[in-house]
Amino acid sequence: MTIGPFVLYADFGVKSFVTRDKEIREMLKKRMNEGVECAKRVGCKWALVVPGRFDEGLEWDYQTANVIDNLKMCAEICEPSGLVLVLEPLNAWTNHPGLFLTKIPQAYQICRAVGSPSCKIVNDIYHQQITEGNLIPNIDMAWSEIAAFHLGDNPGRKEPTTGEINYKNIFRHIKKKGYEGVLCMEHGRSKRGKEGEKAVIEAYRACDS
């Protein structure tokens, strides 16, 4: 059994990573050090980071540069222990308006700029279907920086086979590419009770055949 990414930082209401504010940077350092110790206790390799809200009053490229600088600082704290920060782009249309990080190409650009084995991407297929689609080509383009996947169908964010995403093809594709990481079931169930639990199991069996 492998523990998937735990949430280390995901304050949706704060302009955090996009700033140069010294107090924010000290807060992030503290969070990273706490995260490293938590990961050691539970034996976890990945820690999820959402870089917070974007700043309406600051040019976008400056925000990107600030995010990169802050993540470099965070990655330096995590590297000695082997903890990997995984950035999660989230959709702005259905669930999380106002956030800085929304797309896989954007996360890829940031990870490449940070240039650390402790800064990677968790590709949430549900969110990215809403934000950009083009799922398999984006997986291929960002492959070197993807450390984990979150799963859920769209619309509805229930188990695979309940929406429009072809998980069977996605699973085949990442298996062919040699993926051996975690697949995190971050979704609800289309049915309640025991029948709903059976439906989830059957859905994954169907997609993994």
Question: Across the structure, where does each feature detected by a protein language model lie?
Answer:
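Active-site-proximal loop/turn and secondary-structure-junction residues that shape catalytic pockets
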Residues: 7-12, 51-55, 89-93, 125-127, ...
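Conserved beta-strand positions in the central sheet of alpha/beta enzyme cores
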Residues: 4-7, 48, 86, 147-150, ...
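Generic alpha-helical scaffold signal
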Residues: 11, 22, 26-29, 164, ...
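Residue-level detector of anion-binding/catalytic polar loops
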Residues: 1-2, 45, 84, 180
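Short hydrophobic interaction/assembly module
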Residues: 1-17
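Generic short alpha-helical segment signal, independent of protein family or function
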Residues: 1-4, 37, 205
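Histidine-acidic metal/acid-base catalytic patches
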Residues: 43, 101-123, 127-209
